[in-house]
Amino acid sequence: MRASYLFTSESVSEGHPDKVCDRISDEIVDLFYREGPKAGIDPWQIRAACETLATTNKVVIAGETRGPKSVTNEQIEGVVRAAIKDIGYEQEGFHWKTCDIEILLHPQSADIAQGVDALQPGEVKEEGAGDQGIMFGYATNETPDLMPAPIFYAHKILRLISEARHSGREKVLGPDSKSQVTVQYENGKPVGVREIVVSHQHLVPDLTSSQVRDIVEPYVREALPKDWITPKTIWHINPTGKFYIGGPDGDAGLTGRKIIVDTYGGAAPHGGGAFSGKDPTKVDRSAAYAARYVAKNIVAAGLADRCTLQLAYAIGVARPLSIYIDTHGTGKVPEEQLEKAAAQAMDLTPRGIRSHLDLNRPIYARTSAYGHFGRTPDNEGGFSWEKTDLVEQLKRAL
């Protein structure tokens, strides 16, 4: 391991155009999970794959669903407008009341459904994966939430500013923003911040970069460890000088374009599949959650300081094709033993993951901004993959 290096990660706010689309897609997934039980539909039978495009005063929603027929386009439109309103868009080029919404949802392909729903030989009551693919999970003990420091603090900066904006304390700030944090590492441990970037939309046209810095700097300092900012830290606040036109009016958004922001900020591999808009039969989402869950519990158990875990699946096949663990030289037991322990401690079939993490619930809109990982599990079942309740099972399996 290098003695000294810099590593950078970025985050974006819930008002970033791509995150607006992630939020809308996940709100629709949640809608189907809320309405399904009301119509007598087993949550295990709900399916949703929803993609969103947002641009100037226009939202287009396309994809495949299976669920209650009681979910109408009017109901979906209402959910979309409520999401945009909650994010805070009331500007001329993108307003929750007046933007045009086009809905192009249709039933899930029968060819895909037969692979997911069909019983597999020798695997009674098991459902196959919704697609092939590889998924990664990662954990490190360099922050309390067992996340890499650069992405952890990049998220925290924007989350604090967003809370201030929503509370009404910072009325001149708009919904769209980005952050980037360059962290200095010594002997593999984060010790300070070399560079800070914050680009934040403002609602007053002639607000200067200096004035925006006066607004956001206290939140940046609150987010970071006290001694990490020094006189040598370089600040870049609205470096282009002006950020008045923001959101989908300034830059078109799409679901699934912020997969590194959603995960580990580039500190770990990514299998390439996005999360938002997908029900948990899609292993792009559910298996990535499971991989994080197992990796986090390995680190929480003290079995490694860092852990990368890869899972692989084939469409229509229930069992994972492979489980791979790399502890980056920090493991307390051989990685081959950890791989066996992971398989014993948790059922990593799609059904096993959905059951263990209780994923057949309307818990997805809350994941659509500020990362799917490093979050606090809530009372409604959200972020269940962040629990550390697998520690004892892993230890017993070794």
From Swiss-Prot:
Biological or metabolic pathway of the protein: Amino-acid biosynthesis; S-adenosyl-L-methionine biosynthesis; S-adenosyl-L-methionine from L-methionine: step 1/1
GO CC annotation: cytosol
Residues that coordinate or bind L-methionine: E64, Q108, D251, K282
Cofactor details (free text): Binds 2 divalent ions per subunit. Binds 1 potassium ion per subunit.
Residue sites binding ATP per the record: H16, D176, S177, K178, K242, F243, D251, R257, K258, A274, K278
GO molecular function, one term: magnesium ion binding
Keywords: ATP-binding, Cytoplasm, Magnesium, Metal-binding, Nucleotide-binding, One-carbon metabolism, Potassium, Transferase
Broadest EC class assigned to this enzyme: transferase
UniProt-listed Enzyme Commission number(s): 2.5.1.6
PROSITE patterns recorded: ADOMET_SYNTHASE_1, ADOMET_SYNTHASE_2
Region ranges (Flexible loop): 108-118
Cofactor: Mg(2+); K(+)
Chain residues that bind Mg(2+): D18
UniProt catalytic activity: L-methionine + ATP + H2O = S-adenosyl-L-methionine + phosphate + diphosphate
Keyword set includes Lipid metabolism: no
Gene Ontology biological-process entries: one-carbon metabolic process; S-adenosylmethionine biosynthetic process
Annotated K(+) binding sites: E51
Localization per Swiss-Prot or TrEMBL: Cytoplasm
Function recorded in the entry: Catalyzes the formation of S-adenosylmethionine (AdoMet) from methionine and ATP. The overall synthetic reaction is composed of two sequential steps, AdoMet formation and the subsequent tripolyphosphate hydrolysis which occurs prior to release of AdoMet from the enzyme.
Family the entry assigns: Belongs to the AdoMet synthase family.
HAMAP family according to UniProt: S_AdoMet_synth1
Subunit structure: Homotetramer; dimer of dimers.
Name the UniProt record assigns to this protein: S-adenosylmethionine synthase
Gene source species: Bradyrhizobium diazoefficiens (strain JCM 10833 / BCRC 13528 / IAM 13628 / NBRC 14792 / USDA 110)
